[in-house]
């Protein structure tokens, strides 16, 4: 049996990042809603418990509390943001509105040399105080410590930014150690899990494969499964995992909805029918999809339509399979959390994903989502462990709705043709441009990244079609053509992301080639928005 960490979710958009950090320490963990029963907490028998953040306020929802068993079990507890506030309230402290809300980067001073923060710092002040670079996101604050607690961290606007009761193993921080913006956050969570909870670091991807294969076999039995194959990383790994579990009971359905990347269809058929030796059915449904998208400009409606049409195609194909009872999808956790579809149903919806938001209740197939609780980097690790080729595993992700969410406003075939050619040029230039020592000296990449392609140094890159025209001059004539935006981000988990600082020379080549080679485009811009506040995809 693996040691386990229990994560209680109060509705934060980044709760799964806590799980990811715990897994990086090779410790098994699960997320469950904050309102589980005392009996559940006791039977789960965790080595430690982590309380997540929340969009709620301790003033507005007095029911949003941790079960009493959390405090009775005698195991270490870590409270994060709202988790710190509910810990304070439930154990006799005081929380109040803050007249200075903190959202974003902050510098926190550590106090008291507690086991959680001792010798962890980003820099020291002239007075010798250890400081941490962290990410804050709170409106309330702890105003009075509960009995037995001492101050662990502070900021000028949040005098109690961390607290600890070392005797009972209770620790809490107002900032978010789970996000990458908190530079020492991974170390803090690892210290809590391995050092304070003393959990064994014995959970690895090999274990997950064995557990997932066993679960798929148990769920599916002798029934057949169809899977929507897009050529992206997620559906590829899902197909490989399910194929390992049930073999020829899986039929992959590749739908050409007219919104694919350049030469996508040929690549997918060659790769999956050839390499995976799986059953792959190729369906050209471009007229069906584009017809239903005509005149639709709202991004949510576009996603819903694309999801609905996918379901219709799958249902039609399933009728040809006498024993097809399951629809498999490559849904991963960032898809779920942005759709407000976590296990707890507490997170607010940012946008729906066709995998999780477009399925009607009348769907005649049961849903199989073996990657639903994994992050993108974990999916890649799983793909490698399954023996998939690097060109498949490390390909940049591509959304299920395809170019439909990269064409702003109405989707037209002409727009898609322009966009896929511009996108292909961008990707080609990223692949063939190698990071240099000059790039490292300019701070565009790390010294150890010199020699890698800029495609490999970015996590996701693509072009976006903007349905606006701008004036240009080509030759001696005036042009009035469309605009494309280039987007490239760097991230480890796709929950947060930084825009990629690409060399100007690379961006210049992309712009020149797109404008000269794609008739109908005369302007190229580069997106320098991070996530948050923006999402990675524009729609």
From Swiss-Prot:
First-level EC class: ligase
Residues annotated as the enzyme's active site: 81 (nucleophile), 176, 178
Domain GMPS ATP-PPase: from-to ranges: 203-395
PROSITE patterns cross-referenced by the UniProt entry: GATASE_TYPE_1, GMPS_ATP_PPASE
GO molecular function, one term: ATP binding
Pfam families: GATase (PF00117), GMP_synt_C (PF00958), NAD_synthase (PF02540)
Keywords of the record: ATP-binding, Glutamine amidotransferase, GMP biosynthesis, Ligase, Nucleotide-binding, Purine biosynthesis
Entries under HAMAP family matching the protein: GMP_synthase
Assembly with partners or alone: Homodimer.
UniProt protein name: GMP synthase [glutamine-hydrolyzing]
Species: Cupriavidus pinatubonensis (strain JMP 134 / LMG 1197)
